[in-house]
Amino acid sequence: MIELATMSSLCPDWNLSEIIDGMKCHGYKGLEPRVEWGHACGIEADLSGDERRAIRRQMEGEGLDICCIATGVRMAEVDREKRAEHVEDLKRYIDLAADLGCGLVRTFGGQRDRDREWQYVVDYVVEGYAQVVDWAEERGVVILMETHDDWCSSPPVRAVVEQVGHAHLKILWDFMHTQRVLERPGESFSIFAEHVAHLHAHDGQYVDGKMQVGALGEGVIDHQTPLQLLGKMGFAGYFSVEVIHKVGAGGGAEGVMAQYANAFRRMLASI
């Protein structure tokens, strides 16, 4: 079954209790906190053990999940010393996820070395993930590599996951980003569907040559087709709304949360 989740990026000024109220009002099951951005929910790697236990109790008491920890970790970071820092950061986020009862941690490939061929870059990224997948397995957490930035195209992402060859590295399929590089949903699905463990959702329109995020089902990004394909294969995971509002910008979160929930339910009903 495909469940509905929201990222804290949608409502960065809401504390955890406010997020829970919004989730329950609009039928969301999962929360995906975006760490490192100072969101009011306060979910970060520096939480104490007591704070982690309290958050977990609060979510579980409401029948809700922390479904994924969204990090800014980048495994294609060209500078090896900086990449080593990303690896250590990822270990801390895996520990955070485990303590919160969360089974997924999102990472990026990030900007690749443009002077190198793809196979070299894939090998380099594989080397990074290989340093941490056993750590993730020990803690019962799956690392996700998102189709994002230099890694919007499906084949390189699949290549990384298959070369690592570990059950605790999977793919986060962001429907928008694969389509932005002109892949049809069916093409992406055929390339890596068996490795997909989490989904990101945000619709939009091209305005002056740039993507402007908007209401689900009213833009140019096809969410219906990939949901249908995944549903037929028995995918069980989260469709996580990634509409990003800046901290302190105010307004908009409640309406976006409601609109995406209603559109998502209409899409599921037609599958």
Question: What do these predicted ranges mean?
Answer:
Residues S8, T71-V73, G109, I143-T147, ...:
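Short glycine-centered, acidic/aromatic-flanked micro-motifs in structured strand/loop junctions
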Residues G38-I43, M75-D79, Q111-W118, R180-L182, ...:
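A short acidic, helix-capping loop that chelates divalent metal ions and anchors anionic groups
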Residues K29-A40:
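A short beta-strand-loop structural module common to alpha/beta enzyme folds
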Residues S17-E18, G22, R53, R57-D65, ...:
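Active-site acidic/histidine proton-transfer and metal-coordination neighborhood
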Residues M1-K29, E60-E62, E138, S153-I271:
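Histidine-acidic metal/acid-base catalytic patches
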Residues E44-R53:
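Aromatic- and glycine-enriched glycan-recognition loops and surfaces
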